[in-house]
Amino acid sequence: MSQDFVEIAKIGATYKLNGELNLYPLANSIETLLSYGDWYIQLPATNVWQQLKGESVLKRADKVYIKLANINNADTAKKYVNALIGVPKRALPQLAEDEVYFKDLIGCSVKNINNDSFGVVVDIIETGANEVLVCKEDNSEYLIPYVKQYIVSEDLNSKKIVVDWEYDY
């Protein structure tokens, strides 16, 4: 398949003897995860996405479990542990002009208005109040609040972000 996929969940350990698996959403909420139509799976150590044939998805409190079709015991289910679940990028909702998918920020180079480099975005921390870009340059790590006040410009096609931020903040 030549289309781009976005990871929305990761499969964890087996849950029951009948082959159910723990499912860890990478989306903001379990409801968001469950709202996507067709899911695809990428087994560990492969770059191949295959359409996922799920039998059922069970939500209990804040946990999610998945039962894959034709997987009827824990031994068979173990080969799916640490597999990724994805959806085609085209399946994601269209964003407003001032919105971005956080995954698109990963790998962006970050410089300030003085052209000082903060390296590249390697992670995003969700604090509740706002998100924070985790940028790495050589052996240094910089935490930059991802708020309009500090983001001067973003060019996601060129993977570049300009911030109004200094090393000593």
Swiss-Prot record:
It comes from the Bacteria. It is found in: Cytoplasm. Its main location: cytoplasm. Residues 97-169 form the PRC barrel domain. Disulfide bonds: none annotated. One of its GO terms (molecular function) is ribosome binding. The keyword rRNA processing applies. SUPFAM superfamilies: PRC-barrel domain, Translation proteins. Keywords: Chaperone, Cytoplasm, Ribosome biogenesis, rRNA processing. One of its GO terms (cellular component) is cytoplasm. NCBIfam families: 16S_RimM, PRK14591.1. An accessory protein needed during the final step in the assembly of 30S ribosomal subunit, possibly for assembly of the head region. Essential for efficient processing of 16S rRNA. May be needed both before and after RbfA during the maturation of 16S rRNA. It has affinity for free ribosomal 30S subunits but not for 70S ribosomes. Belongs to the RimM family. This is Ribosome maturation factor RimM.
